[in-house]
């Protein structure tokens, strides 16, 4: 059945900012959808609030709106663009919920917009827990015994009926948000309360606990002729109880019998038909009892999901692309398989290799968070590996996580019987470190029966891990490493580093092991992902390594450039770096063969048809060097780009160069120069530029001496960090003592000598009340091109990745911008930059300070590119390949005159706001971790507000980042520190003028009273200074108060917005309870005066209700006209 001819234009809704449970996989699926629609001659209208996405590039759609995914905004875009259809199944839960809201508001009917990909009824049946249960029953399948609740009273009645443990699953949420396993009434009330709150329909499913069962997933697709294919079965190594996003998963399934698999297939096909998904795909999760084989259907997603991206990359079967074609009316047998070019999409993929996905976590960013893995997803990223067997695949995946000690290690003494007993107790609870603890227990002598009893991980997987340990012990104890034994180690997934450690050679022994391996002629070969287990030839070069006999690499003629990706998403290194890598691939592909190396299944860069060759491999020195050596034999290689993928590839630069690999762009020596305190200090001295006073310290005594010389407050951090890891603002000696004690405790015991750290702490003067600025620029050795000057909304002290910022800057003078331009030129010249550089500055009392410089792509490059209409990363890639800025001006990649540092009258304003994952991270007793922002980055994603002025743009950024955006009336609670009290009267008067009622603690209320401003007094909550914020609180009843504290008022829904600026770190726990309650209630809250002042401007803009809705194509045209007029 050919495609429908009545659909001429389609609106695609993206997934918005990167959050836990909904990450880069939806940029991948949305990008595929846009490409397919445009290939089919359909006009594409795209809406997404995330600027760090390839799908929001202007060439991906005819009209691209970087706007909040909110019903009023979506209606304005629909009214303007009049699409024939809406495709919501490729933007995750956000897009699905937005489509449902548009349907319920009557917008789709009003503008005659048809929903394609899945009907409202199908979405409802798949997402509504009660309706889905009926579908499962009608399919002849079984659900866990369950009931629906909309209140805690209903929850209690269900608990009486079923008993404990119970699983709580909210309707219409993603990543298991608000879900959990309750073992008693207290846990049930906490989890179910959160679930009802986070469900848009205030609905939770309470079901019998099935912890310990085996968990499986099926990815299915169905067309309008009722053809159904199972794209990929996936098995979770962790049993039911751990969210699939937090579990190690594998394909194909290893522990299902053929009969069980056929039964899952039959149930899955019946369910996709019963739900009514007839032009797209879905994901269905199952539980199988390990002893009886009883099958229970857990849930389904009637859309492209996180697992869809994994299944696509695992098999080479492009689910999002095919789902889009099905939504247009094609049938599976009419769609060609891109990889084979000779089989239709109705042929189910077959794989002859093993795929393993390992999650990456960020608990270190959230002190106090409960590290237990449950049904609510907590991982921030994932890595995938392909190999010839499970052991090799697991080893590759674990080292792909790019986290210290994430691979198995056998360092130190063999665990004692006492330690084994402790480890067996520890692995009862699933955590990030469970598999490392499990391996140590096995090394120490734990039996398979003991490990199975503790974890309920299927014995087949445990046997494989036992075999890895057995091989490791053979390597450790052998007299010599024979070719046979070394190959056995490689087949068991052991890296050269791991083998070196087993042989007692340490990290430095990696080169020795590699040289020995090469002497033996033992090198990996590269196999092709072909969707058909080699039954047909593959037309697309998509490779993975394994230790087999024959390589499938083919010779090439053009010179090649290898681009190293950023690996798994993490806080501090996310989708922004994949964006820059993809731009480099797109641009350099015009003149070179582009070779992409990455291990993240969520990203656009790992799409099989994005680059000329794709290697799905770990980003380690060993793996990258092997790829370079293999590619050299296939054709000429110009060099490797390490500047675009963040810290991961950057950290490999020096070693790759030393091994003879040409590094394109800024040299490793120049990268080190910018990160070396003394050398960079010389660059600044020569340029006559200021830096905050600083010192270094290896001990507490040295740290105190430096802090006293510099003067408190100081910013303390370890050497060489990404995302502000370990940074803290320290206000006194007592706090400094704690920081150094913690640093000593975290360092390896054998590296601490006489209370001295192995590497120095960096101590800087903290610039209080300074204006912080980010500058992104290009440099070719002679000419500088400013990509963007971004002014932070918060004062210095909040990590640049968490701070809101505006482009163009809103308060900087022409003279200040001139000084920033001159400073950036001097630094780029002094550091010998060839490509991108990011410099962070601060203005304090109009004195310019340089905070740091990074000679690489920064996380603000996509934002600056979208705000200025210039593809900075594409130009950077060409400069790294040897071209000049003048060349880029001539070829149209850069503006013919001027640059992104110029401000034009009438120019649109862009505001970037960060999105934080605090609601995901709770303490063991169920409270959210503290949200206070500081120098350590904690955000997972970002949004962009785009409008004619700062207030409107900031208002949009808040609407995009937080459900409902900013309130326009209601009650505001204010509690500020002593320093901020002098600014309080003006803020209070403005709030009154805007129609808000004020609530305050006694101290703040008394200040307001002196200025004739009345407020409602609430009781103060205080905790003992420097104690655990979980500690019991003392309630102080204030004279004239309403008899309640602010937490009680928040819980009663009587507070609409909060301003709570804390004092120094020691007393910051005072506001913890307030901030935790506000997070639980989804209230907008501000912890700095400057951001609250910005919010007041935005609230006034919201009240006018006159947002300007403009596509980025229209914006670029307007910007071009302004520049042409000016120059």
Swiss-Prot record:
Annotated region described as Carbamoyl phosphate synthetic domain, given as residue ranges: 552-962
Binding site for Mg(2+) 4: 852, 854
GO cellular component: cytoplasm
Positions of Mn(2+) 1 binding: 285, 299
Residues holding Mn(2+) 3: 840, 852
Xref: SMART domains: CPSase_L_D3, MGS
Swiss-Prot/TrEMBL catalytic activity: hydrogencarbonate + L-glutamine + 2 ATP + H2O = carbamoyl phosphate + L-glutamate + 2 ADP + phosphate + 2 H(+)
Top-level taxon in the UniProt lineage: Bacteria
UniProt-annotated stretches for the region Carboxyphosphate synthetic domain: 1-402
Self-association and partners: Composed of two chains; the small (or glutamine) chain promotes the hydrolysis of glutamine to ammonia, which is used by the large (or ammonia) chain to synthesize carbamoyl phosphate. Tetramer of heterodimers (alpha,beta)4.
Protein name, UniProt field: Carbamoyl phosphate synthase large chain
